[in-house]
């Protein structure tokens, strides 16, 4: 399953008869989100998915075109989402301490700037109802021009989908 773009990645972890986690070259392991990203990636890999943890890359770099090529020509061109799960980009958003409930809305906004699929850090435990309310407010806001396809919540080492846009 190795193809040309995998020269930018090294295998980090293989789950027997399941998925793999790859790290992009140049990934900053001292990044505060690194351990969360690895935990999230392992969660999806255990479900049989191939997950690539991505590093920020300048859009003029040839590696950007190899890895983030599908974003060219979209509103997400020049953006660098954090994860590539089975060929689909996801953005992980955490918050700066201390946690305040209004930061959930900010995480959704920042995540939607990077990808239409977002994973937010909810280790402080905002309620599902509150998070869903924030999504509805964002979507119904006329000045918010981003599309949110899916939103996952990362809590205490586990990941669960909280929102998926209904197909019309």
Q: Language model features by range: what are they?
A:
Residues 1-68, 74-77, 95-168:
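Metal-dependent nuclease catalytic core centered on acidic motifs
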Residues 83-94:
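Conserved catalytic cores of phosphodiester-cleaving nucleases, focusing on short active-site segments
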């Amino acid at each position: 399953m190795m193809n040309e773009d995998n020269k930018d990645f090294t295998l980090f972890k293989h789950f027997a008869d399941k998925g793999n986690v790859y790290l992009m070259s140049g990934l900053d392991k001292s990044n505060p989100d690194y351990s969360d990203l690895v935990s999230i990636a392992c969660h999806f890999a255990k479900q049989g998915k191939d997950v690539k943890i991505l590093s920020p890359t300048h859009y003029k770099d040839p590696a950007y075109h190899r890895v983030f090529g599908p974003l060219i020509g979209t509103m997400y061109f020049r953006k660098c989402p954090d994860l590539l799960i089975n060929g689909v980009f996801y953005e992980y958003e955490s918050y700066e301490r201390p946690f305040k409930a209004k930061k959930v809305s900010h995480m959704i906004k920042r995540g939607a700037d990077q990808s239409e699929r977002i994973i937010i850090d909810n280790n402080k435990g905002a309620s599902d109802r509150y998070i869903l309310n924030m999504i509805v407010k964002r979507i119904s806001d006329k000045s918010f021009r981003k599309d949110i396809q899916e939103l996952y919540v990362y809590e205490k080492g586990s990941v669960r989908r909280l929102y998926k846009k209904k197909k019309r």
